[in-house]
Regions:
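Asp-box/BNR beta-propeller blade signature and adjacent active/binding-site loops
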Residues: 1-352
Length: 352
């Protein structure tokens, strides 16, 4: 059913969920790989995972990546295509590929940031290898050769683009949670449409022990906010702000999120910030809104399952009704972690 979140100055209306990729029907799973990027008005690429339903109960990336193109803001999609780099890597047997984030440059170039994992451990997708980048200049018809975009092992958790510059944040740790001082969050930038990346900074959070997932968002004033997941305090999201596009940072008090947050994903739509991800203890799918990217509301549950699901991503699109946030996420269809890929639309209605 649809959900309405009421606030003094606005309401957020979230449509009913729709199945985007029916993995149950094809007896597969869809862990990770929810990247999307709009490379022309109303035209975007949407990635998803096609992975084993039995390895780690469906909660691994043992498989390959698919993608579809929509040219009408998500009303219809092309037939699925397998991402060649992911298929070749899988068949070679050295590592598997996920597309954690993708961005579209002003000239229409699609930049896909790819994670690599060995197939040697069954649990999820660790250890992480160094990330790779591939590009398409023809709307996903063909792809460049992959190259190592960051020399540190780890997981790129987020990438955003502003004024033609791509900003990417990686947690430099081949495993999930931080355990030592060298496990830090680094911010990289590309000023040539993803052909190369340079390090800008290390986000100076004083302690990254038991930290993992992270997210970034630019606010309306042009400040860049960074957030990190704290396993020890899932209702306190580490927060830092940069006033110079990621070169330097000010660490602030953690943001309080009443229902907890894992896998935080952020967006800005019609002047309202949106935060969504798994709730505390790996249960439920929760959505928060804020007017300043700091003070978040009490949170609203979008789903109440537990298990290896509710990994998500989002993209702001526009149709005849105005802007909407397309949220893509995984949801259980069987067992602990066999998941379909789902879509929901969130719209903001201003009351003023």
């Amino acid at each position: 059913m649809s959900i309405t979140i009421e606030h003094e100055h606005y309401r957020a209306v979230i449509d009913e969920p729709e199945i985007y990729v029916d993995n149950e029907k094809r007896k597969r799973s869809g862990h990770m790989t929810h990247a999307m990027a709009e490379f022309a008005p109303g035209t975007f690429i949407d990635f998803n995972a096609n992975c084993s339903p039995t390895r780690c109960g469906g909660h691994s990336v043992y498989g390959w990546v698919e993608y579809r193109i929509s040219r009408d803001a998500g009303k219809t999609y092309s037939e699925a295509k397998a991402l060649p780099y992911s298929v070749e890597s899988f068949l070679e047997g050295n590592w598997t590929i996920s597309v954690e984030k993708a961005v579209a440059c002003p000239d229409g170039t699609i930049v896909a940031l790819c994670l690599r994992n060995t197939m040697l451990e069954e649990v999820c997708c660790e250890p992480w290898l160094t990330p790779m980048c591939i590009r398409s200049t023809d709307g996903g018809m063909t792809w460049s050769e992959p190259y190592e975009c960051i020399p540190y092992r780890g997981r790129i958790y987020d990438a955003v683009i502003r004024d033609g510059v791509i900003y990417a944040m990686i947690f430099c740790n081949e495993h999930f949670l931080g355990t030592s001082p060298e496990h830090v969050y680094r911010v990289y930038a590309s000023r040539d449409n993803g052909q190369s990346f340079e390090e800008l900074s290390v986000v100076p959070w004083p302690d990254t022990t038991r930290r993992g997932y992270c997210s970034m968002i630019f606010d309306l004033a042009g400040d860049l906010h960074a957030y990190a997941y704290n396993e020890a305090k899932e209702r306190e999201m580490d927060h830092a702000v940069s006033h110079d596009c990621g070169k330097t940072w000010t660490v602030t008090e953690p943001c309080y999120v009443a229902k907890g947050i894992r896998n935080p994903q952020t967006a800005l739509i019609d002047g309202v910030f949106v935060l969504h991800g798994r709730g505390e203890n790996g249960r439920d799918f929760v959505c928060y809104t804020s007017e300043n990217a700091v003070d978040w509301d009490e949170g609203t549950y979008l789903g109440r399952n537990s298990g290896g699901c509710y990994y998500s991503n989002n993209i702001v699109l526009k149709d005849e009704r105005g802007d909407f946030l397309l949220i893509q996420y995984s949801d259980l269809y069987d067992g602990w972690a066999r998941v379909n890929t789902m879509h929901r639309k969130l719209r903001i209605e201003q009351k003023d």
